[in-house]
């Protein structure tokens, strides 16, 4: 257990210690080879919140501005400060810099108990190394252990890389999701976003 704690840390602000069971030796090797460690928070202190916000702004501002939502710094920060949100944060060991995070809440969506993912954000230099998959896997296992039957998330229709990523892991549009509009001419108008969901599971 001491070896595991070198890579996944807990405090009174973070998740319950029994959830350390989610971490396997395979996880430890994965994190070690990446040169990162993970911390899981129920609440972010101001400095770390700003780091998470900066990563979202860097990765997502352009997509927000292309949509009908637009981008507003203060509104996004307000959303990220919500007490119900929990964060899985990934830090680089050498620089101690935040390089990625996943934020989520336990909730009910369309009458289904679920873990709702708000953000999966990665710094560009850590992409393509299965970190997104690792975060999604552990979110799914966490949902399963909390008896949350489903995982929900919202994704911009213009974010094709994200759509392909989620489809690969069996996410499909929920019936409550905005739908495409198809015209007789063959023209298709995509909504700004889709609501995707899948069942939580303990095995990946």
From Swiss-Prot:
One of its GO terms (molecular function) is histone H4 acetyltransferase activity. It comes from the Eukaryota. Keywords: Acyltransferase, Cytoplasm, Nucleus, Transferase. It is found in: Cytoplasm; Nucleus. Acetyl-CoA binds at residues 120-122, 128-133, 159. The record marks 119 as: Essential for catalytic activity. Substrate binds at residues 64, 107-109, 118, 154, 176. The keyword DNA damage does not apply. Transmembrane segments: none annotated. GO terms for cellular component: cell division site; cytoplasm; cytosol; nucleus. The keyword Glycoprotein does not apply. Its EC number is 2.3.1.257. Residues 39-202 form the N-acetyltransferase domain. It is an enzyme of class 2 (transferase). One of its GO terms (biological process) is protein maturation. It catalyses: N-terminal L-seryl-[histone H4] + acetyl-CoA = N-terminal N(alpha)-acetyl-L-seryl-[histone H4] + CoA + H(+); N-terminal L-seryl-[histone H2A] + acetyl-CoA = N-terminal N(alpha)-acetyl-L-seryl-[histone H2A] + CoA + H(+). Belongs to the acetyltransferase family. NAA40 subfamily. PANTHER family: N-ALPHA-ACETYLTRANSFERASE 40. N-alpha-acetyltransferase that specifically mediates the acetylation of the N-terminal residues of histones H4 and H2A. This is N-alpha-acetyltransferase 40. It comes from Schizosaccharomyces pombe (strain 972 / ATCC 24843). The lineage of its organism: Eukaryota, Fungi, Dikarya, Ascomycota, Taphrinomycotina.
